[in-house]
Amino acid sequence: MLFNLFKNTLWAFFVLAILQTSALSFTLEVAGNIENTTYPVKKSYLFTDKQLLAMPVRSITTSTSWTPQRKFEGIGVADILARVGAKGSTLTFYALNDYYIDVPLSDVEKYNMILAYKMDGVMLKIRNFGPLFLVYPRDAAGPELNSPLYNSRFIWQVDRIVIK
């Protein structure tokens, strides 16, 4: 009986370790009109979570339509575009559920948005906007970003960007 208790406890710790590891693991695929690829046949660049977390950290403190003011930390969209050698005028951000939104490249230049992976120092999970959440500096930019058009561009659960 004691052996079964030990075996079940060990199994529970093993499952918990797997769940914790997988909860933080994510990727971002960037495809379309890009110069640098990790998968030339697909013409795409696949970032692992380790690669993304190693990039310079940017932060935006802002409210969203779903949250009061929070500190978001993540990767600058401009940094991702530079890494892949993006050329185009439109970025299509896709979520895990295949929801997508088109964002003009001019937004990146004007607002310096981030793909956030943390909110108030806590890693985002799928149930709370993760793994990646496109965040604009809504509070700092004035009333223009507090509109239905820009609210629709705050896409969460991002896993893919296509450059057109």
Region annotations inferred by a language model:
Residues A23-K164:
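N-terminal intrinsically disordered, low-complexity segments enriched in P/E/S/T
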Residues L2-F3, T21-L24:
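Intrinsically disordered, low-complexity segments enriched in Ser/Pro/Gly/Ala and basic residues
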Residues T9-Q20:
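Bacterial N-terminal signal peptides
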Residues M1-W11:
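Bacterial N-terminal signal peptides that target proteins for export
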